[in-house]
C-alpha cells in the first residue's frame, strides 16, 4: 500500500522581510507557485537566528545550525555559544586536549599554528575564539605561534577581511605573541566539493611556504583587493618568514563547523589521502580540531566534542518503523543527513539518502538553477514510489547563489526554486500527503547594502512556514526552527517524545 508522505521542504536561504523592494531577490522574483501556497494555505513566520537556534543574540542563522535545530526538535546550543562560554568562564585554560597538544609543542621547542576562518561571522569560527586560544598560548608560555588566516567574504562583507586581520594583528601586538604567517581565501582553504586543486594551493602556503610573499597580512589583503580579488578569493600567500608547519608542531584548526573543515583536515590527518601528492607524505603534526569534523578521522583530537542528542527526528522515526528519504544536491547533502541527524554520520534503519551532484562551476551565479530541477525530478519519482512516510528535502539555490552577491542571479535562483517546489509539492498532494514549506535562515532577501554594494552574508530575518494539505489549521506566531519536528509528528502518526522540547506551531 502506498504511503501518504509528510514532506519537509527546506528552501535554503529563503528569508522573509517587510522590505519588499531594495535588494530583495525573494520579493523581486516571479514565483507564482510559492505565492499561491502562501495565499491558499496557513502561513506564519518563525525565528531562525540568535537565541532561538542556540546562537548568541543577534547572530545570523546558518545551514548547519538550522538543520540541527529542525532535526532535533529542541533548541540546540551551538559550538559557537559553548566555546565562547568556556573562554568567559576560564574553562578553556583547562581544556585537556588544548593543554596536552600545546604543551607537546612548547616542551619540544616546536611551533603552535592556529589555522582557520578569521572574523566575527560566527558561522564557521569567531574572532573571540582566536583571542581565547592566543591568550591561552601566552598563558602557557608559548614562544612560537603562527597564524594561518582564512578570509571570509561570504558570511561577512567581501571587504571586511582587512579589518578582521587588523584586529587580529592588534591582539598579537597586545599579547606580544604570534605572527600571521599566511593568508588564504576560503574559496581555496575551505572547499567542500572535492576541488583538491584549490585546497592544494592553501596547503602549499601553510606547509611549504609557497605563494606570493608579502611583508605582512595588511599588505597581502591590499594587494588582493587591488587585483579585484575580494576576501573569499584571496590567493594563498605567505606573510612572514619561518611560519611553515613542520613535523612535531601543533596545528589547531579554529573552525567549529565541520563541513568546510573536513577536506583540509583529511589532507593533514588521513594516511590514505589521494586528492593530490603531499610532498614528503603526511605531516607528522599534533592536530587539534576545535569541534568534531568527522568521527572516523584518524590522527587528530577534538577540543570540544559534540553533545549527544537523543531522539532526534530521524532516530525517532526509525525506531518507530517509519521510512524516510533525505534528498539534496551536494552543497546541502550534509545538512539534510549529518546535521539533521544531530551530527550522526551513519543513516538510521529505514533512512534512504539521495545526493544529486551540484554543478561544477566556479561560482553559482553562473548557473543559478544549480541542480534544483534534477533534485525535484528525483524527489517526485521517490514520492510516486509510495515507499516513504517522511521526506526531508533541501533546495540550495537561494543560499548558494545569495552568497555570490549577484542580485539578478539570486532572482533566477528563487524562480528555479519556485518551479522545483511546484513539482514536489504537487506530487505529495497527489499522493494524499502533506507538506511543510520553510527555510533554515535568510540570505536571498537581502542582496545589497544600503550603499548599493553586494551583500553576501546570511541575515537575521525570520523565515516562512507554510502548512500545505494539513487541513484548516491555525498557526501561531513566535515559533522557531526547533518547533518544526513537533509540528510534523502528529501528521506522521507519532506522539512527540519528551526530549523534543519544541512546541507545535499549529494552534490546537
Task: Give the residues covered by each predicted segment.
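Feature captures the catalytic ectodomains and active-site-proximal regions of enzymes
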Residues: 1-508
Amino acid at each position: 500500500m502506498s504511503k501518504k508522505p509528510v514532506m519537509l521542504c527546506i528552501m535554503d536561504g529563503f528569508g522573509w522581510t517587510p522590505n519588499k523592494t531594495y535588494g530583495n531577490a525573494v520579493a523581486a522574483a516571479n514565483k507564482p507557485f510559492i505565492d499561491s501556497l502562501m495565499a491558499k494555505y496557513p502561513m506564519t513566520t518563525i525565528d531562525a537566528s540568535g537565541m532561538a537556534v542556540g546562537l548568541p543574540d543577534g547572530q545570523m542563522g546558518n545551514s548547519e545550525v538550522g538543520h540541527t535545530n529542525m532535526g532535533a526538535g529542541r533548541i540546540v546550543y551551538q559550538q559557537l555559544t559553548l566555546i565562547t562560554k568556556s573562554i568567559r568562564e576560564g574553562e578553556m585554560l583547562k581544556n585537556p586536549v588544548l593543554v596536552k597538544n600545546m604543551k607537546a609543542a612548547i616542551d619540544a621547542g616546536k611551533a603552535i599554528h592556529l589555522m582557520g576562518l578569521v572574523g566575527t561571522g560566527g558561522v564557521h569560527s569567531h574572532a573571540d575564539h582566536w583571542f581565547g586560544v592566543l591568550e591561552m598560548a601566552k598563558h602557557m608560555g608559548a614562544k612560537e605561534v603562527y597564524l594561518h588566516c582564512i578570509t571570509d567574504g561570504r558570511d561577512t562583507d567581501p571587504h571586511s577581511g582587512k579589518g578582521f586581520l587588523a584586529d587580529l594583528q592588534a591582539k598579537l601586538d597586545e599579547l606580544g605573541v604570534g605572527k600571521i604567517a599566511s593568508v588564504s581565501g576560503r574559496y581555496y582553504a575551505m572547499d567542500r566539493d572535492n576541488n583538491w586543486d584549490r585546497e592544494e594551493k592553501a596547503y602549499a602556503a601553510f606547509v611549504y611556504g609557497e605563494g606570493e610573499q608579502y611583508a605582512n597580512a595588511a599588505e597581502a589583503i591590499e594587494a588582493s583587493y587591488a587585483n579585484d580579488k575580494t576576501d573569499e578569493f584571496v590567493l594563498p600567500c605567505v606573510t612572514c618568514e619561518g611560519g611553515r608547519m613542520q613535523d612535531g608542531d601543533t596545528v589547531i584548526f579554529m573552525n567549529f563547523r565541520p563541513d568546510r573543515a573536513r577536506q583540509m583536515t583529511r589532507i593533514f590527518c588521513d594516511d590514505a589521502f589521494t586528492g593530490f601528492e603531499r610532498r614528503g607524505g603526511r605531516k607528522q603534526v599534533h592536530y587539534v580540531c576545535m569541534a568534531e569534523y568527522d568521527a572516523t578521522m584518524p590522527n587528530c583530537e577534538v577540543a570540544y566534542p559534540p553533545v549527544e542528542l537523543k531522539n532526534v527526528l530521524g532516530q525517532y522515526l526509525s525506531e518507530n518503523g517509519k521510512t524516510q528519504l533525505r534528498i539534496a544536491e551536494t552543497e546541502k547533502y550534509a545538512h539534510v543527513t549529518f546535521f539533521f541527524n544531530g551530527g550522526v554520520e551513519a543513516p538510521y534503519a529505514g533512512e534512504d539518502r539521495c545526493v544529486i551532484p551540484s554543478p561544477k562551476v566556479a561560482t553559482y551565479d553562473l548557473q543559478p538553477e544549480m541542480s534544483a530541477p534534477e533534485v525535484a525530478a528525483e524527489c517526485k519519482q521517490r514520492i510516486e514510489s509510495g515507499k516513504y512516510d517522511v521526506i526531508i528535502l533541501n533546495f540550495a539555490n537561494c543560499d548558494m547563489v545569495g552568497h555570490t552577491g549577484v542580485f539578478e542571479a539570486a532572482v533566477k535562483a528563487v524562480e528555479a526554486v519556485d518551479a522545483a517546489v511546484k513539482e514536489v509539492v504537487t506530487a505529495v498532494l497527489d499522493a494524499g500527503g502533506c507538506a511543510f514549506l520553510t527555510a533554515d535562515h535568510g540570505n536571498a532577501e537581502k542582496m545589497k547594502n544600503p550603499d548599493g554594494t553586494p551583500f553576501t552574508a546570511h541575515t537575521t530575518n525570520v523565515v516562512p512556514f507554510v502548512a500545505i494539505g494539513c487541513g484548516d489549521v491555525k498557526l501561531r506566531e513566535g515559533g522557531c526552527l526547533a518547533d518544526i519536528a513537533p509540528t510534523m509528528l502528529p501528521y506522521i502518526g507519532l506522539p512527540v517524545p519528551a526530549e523534543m522540547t519544541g512546541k507545535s506551531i499549529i494552534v490546537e
